[in-house]
Amino acid sequence: MTPYIGSDAIKPYTELLKQKGKDLFVVLRTANKTASELQDLLSGSRLVHMAAADIVNRQSEKMITRSGYSQVAVVGPANVADVLKKLRARYKHFFILIDGYDYANANAKNCSYGFDQLGHGAIACANAGILSAWNPDLSDGRDYVRCAEEAAERMKKNLLRYVTIL
């Protein structure tokens, strides 16, 4: 969901989320090349994506579960470490979906900034890097599942170099 139309985009879902025990992901800052054209503009003294985070925070604070994280979660970019650092430092109860692990300039170290000190509170997502892991030059095409599994394992191994899960 997008917060860029205001808090009334999120409010209608909060009661339903509580009743059904579901979660909602709100996109704050994306990983695509031109995201900064809008999401990194200044809104007063804040960047637009941080102003959006404040809007999300007002709703998410009311929906913190036993885990310590809110049912209203956020999406942040794997290729912009500063955004993940700011989100984790400022909003301890945000669960962060770190999108774009396989984008240019993204890496496991960047992703590590979205996790809390216990190695919780985030999940890193790679799309094409796993779905397109099969290499036609190295295979006859029947082992695409194995190739995807190996790509996911490499991603996990790389993340665990920077994130300690307690």
Regions found by a protein language model. Name each.
Residues 1, 21-25, 116-123, 144:
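A polyampholytic, Gly/Pro-enriched intrinsically disordered region
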Residues 1-73:
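Conserved anion-binding
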Residues 8, 47, 51, 79-82, ...:
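Conserved active-site and cofactor/substrate-binding residues in soluble primary-metabolism enzymes
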Residues 12-15, 51, 86, 110-113, ...:
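Alpha-helical scaffolding segments of alpha/beta enzyme cores, especially the outer helices
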Residues 14-18, 57-61, 85-91, 156, ...:
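Surface-exposed amphipathic alpha-helices with a cationic face
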Residues 26-30, 52-55, 101-104, 123-126, ...:
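Short, surface-exposed, polar/charged, turn-prone segments marking secondary-structure boundaries
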Residues 74, 78-125, 129-133:
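A C-terminal functional module that forms or caps the active site or interfaces directly
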Residues 110-117, 121, 130-166:
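C-terminal helical cap(s) of enzyme catalytic domains, especially alpha/beta-barrels
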